[in-house]
Amino acid sequence: MATPDAGLPGAEGVEPAPWAQLEAPARLLLQALQAGPEGARRGLGVLRALGSRGWEPFDWGRLLEALCREEPVVQGPDGRLELKPLLLRLPRICQRNLMSLLMAVRPSLPESGLLSVLQIAQQDLAPDPDAWLRALGELLRRDLGVGTSMEGASPLSERCQRQLQSLCRGLGLGGRRLKSPQAPDPEEEENRDSQQPGKRRKDSEEEAASPEGKRVPKRLRCWEEEEDHEKERPEHKSLESLADGGSASPIKDQPVMAVKTGEDGSNLDDAKGLAESLELPKAIQDQLPRLQQLLKTLEEGLEGLEDAPPVELQLLHECSPSQMDLLCAQLQLPQLSDLGLLRLCTWLLALSPDLSLSNATVLTRSLFLGRILSLTSSASRLLTTALTSFCAKYTYPVCSALLDPVLQAPGTGPAQTELLCCLVKMESLEPDAQVLMLGQILELPWKEETFLVLQSLLERQVEMTPEKFSVLMEKLCKKGLAATTSMAYAKLMLTVMTKYQANITETQRLGLAMALEPNTTFLRKSLKAALKHLGP
């Protein structure tokens, strides 16, 4: 599908994406890199899809140049103008996935452009530098042979190395004897190369009969059997060979696109993910122009739109989650206006049978996540209606795709918090959906915005088990010293002590008393009074 250079009209109250002025292929790629932990893999899928659709070879030189180009942006509360390159204006998750993708396709990148990008990345003066980005940048610089020689040194922080070693020791109980990465020993490599074909099997037998005498857990044994089965398969095909019709791909000779395997048979990249087909089903490929026309109709607000969902939308049931990702990117769903979003959601909610949970999660992320994170003022009524309607039917997908990312995003502010509070206060929210939301919030690190959303949810008198209530009380009491001046925390405490008075045990009451002791908000007297009502 040839994506037009100009995107669909932006959503109401949403700032344009930093890459909005780039050419269509670059926009599609950067948009795919926004997809959380799977962003790098989705980026590879977009590259392959662009090739199989007959586009020109992806111009990495032009994209790297655009990433380094400085543009004036408004910074700080005083609204001062500063020159800032596009790379540093990208969201943090997009920067991470971009660096991962650059590592994967490094052999096909112009070295001068890559060096410029790495230099820009080093100039990031953020108060909380990202250790993951630093490590990826260091690895890329090593590959290019620039900077101080650090052969044998790890780009990971000492804390990360300790955690990795601990993880390897834990996994080693399964008999795999995992070790943290170390510089290869030339003598060991030479000895390994000279081993006879039967050596590996013998070693495996000796390992199985090791004096440790520990039985391999069933789950780990299943993983091992699966890995052995994978090793017996032919070498993974390149991305080009997976394309329908065998059409030539402009990116066919990129070494990165083939799955690299080490001598131990383990993949350097996620072989399973790369081998997974990212081609759209033939039926959907044929209907792409019609789907684009439907979205255009939604945007233009034409009268007489059919109430029943168009038959073309039934084809969504034929997509796997990865194919749904690709379809959302090609249709530029994140750039729908709020009116178009509401109308599309109306159609999606009327589909029969319902969407699968995994596909509904992908759609939630594509339609809502970027839109919510970009809000600078209160969400429009159209956006709020679309989100609450979608959540009423697909609660689990909305929770998994939105709650965690929005509450943990560094840029979450009043606009995002207000929308989440509206979401958890929905009258149509079933009790089990309330418990689901509560469980997800309890697993997150808490901050000011979390207090507000949690207080709105608990106002609904959520029915929870004693175990879950105990977790809530424990986290609540632990936050007392760190939230002595927080009005949001004080309101949350007041809600818990009044709405859930019958659930609070004597031990929990003592914990609340200690947590409230240093509180300095003007609700202090009300909190003390509520605490007295819990008295023995």
From Swiss-Prot:
Name one cellular component (GO) term.
cytosol
Q: Do you know which CDD domains this protein is assigned to?
A: FANCE_c-term (cd07439)
Q: Where is the composition biased (Basic and acidic residues)?
A: 230-239
Q: How is it modified after translation?
A: Phosphorylated. Phosphorylation by CHEK1 at Thr-346 and Ser-374 regulates its function in DNA cross-links repair.
Q: Where is this region: Interaction with FANCC?
A: 150-371
Chain positions covered by the region annotation Disordered: 171-252
Residue ranges annotated as transmembrane are none
Signal peptide (residue range): none
Q: Which subcellular locations apply to this protein?
A: Nucleus
Q: What is its main location?
A: nucleus
Residues bearing Phosphoserine are 249, 374
Residues bearing PTM Phosphothreonine? 346
Keywords linked to the UniProt accession = Disease variant, DNA damage, DNA repair, Fanconi anemia, Nucleus, Phosphoprotein, Ubl conjugation
For this entry, list what GO says about its biological process. Answer: gene expression; homeostasis of number of cells; interstrand cross-link repair; ovarian follicle development
Q: Which disease is it linked to?
A: Fanconi anemia complementation group E: A disorder affecting all bone marrow elements and resulting in anemia, leukopenia and thrombopenia. It is associated with cardiac, renal and limb malformations, dermal pigmentary changes, and a predisposition to the development of malignancies. At the cellular level it is associated with hypersensitivity to DNA-damaging agents, chromosomal instability (increased chromosome breakage) and defective DNA repair.
Q: What does this protein do?
A: As part of the Fanconi anemia (FA) complex functions in DNA cross-links repair. Required for the nuclear accumulation of FANCC and provides a critical bridge between the FA complex and FANCD2.
Q: How does it assemble?
A: Belongs to the multisubunit FA complex composed of FANCA, FANCB, FANCC, FANCE, FANCF, FANCG, FANCL/PHF9 and FANCM. The complex is not found in FA patients. Interacts with FANCC and FANCD2.
Q: Which PANTHER family match?
A: FANCONI ANEMIA GROUP E PROTEIN
According to UniProt, the name of this protein is Fanconi anemia group E protein
Please tell me the species this chain comes from. Answer: Homo sapiens
